[in-house]
Amino acid sequence: MDHIKQLRIYPPENGTCELIVIYEIEEPEQLSQNGHYLSVDLGLHNLMTCYDSGNGRTFILGRKYLSLERYFHKEIARVQSVWYAQQSERGIKYPKSSKHIQRLYRKKQNAVKDYLHKTTRWIAEYCRKEDIRCVVVGDIRNIRKEKDMGHKTNQKFHGLPYNR
């Protein structure tokens, strides 16, 4: 880290302080195409379905993502139900969110971020090991706009982390 350009320290928020280090890295050299591709299809039930053109192998990643989502949605709903019941007993009509619920949302966000990082890191290592120089991902711009697939499917679809 010889080329540190900037350090940013943000004050504590929710008990955590944020430190951002901006540094300069050397631009890696561009490798020429070798005709070996990895295509990635993003979906609802499987986060990523990948196809390796070199050996014809297909693999599916992302079922754990749905499991994480399901667990946290159930836990948040349970805690919210208890919290709202307690608040309505006190006569509070529109209760604020509790610290416990906020902590669960943060925990969910961190778990999803961690899982996506591990998944993409695994894909990068696979590409490096198999000498894949080009990864093709389907065009996902405007994928969520003006889509109506029913109430339940829309909820799942709009909850997917396509912007990451």
Residue positions per predicted region:
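An N-terminal domain-cap segment
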Residues: 2-8
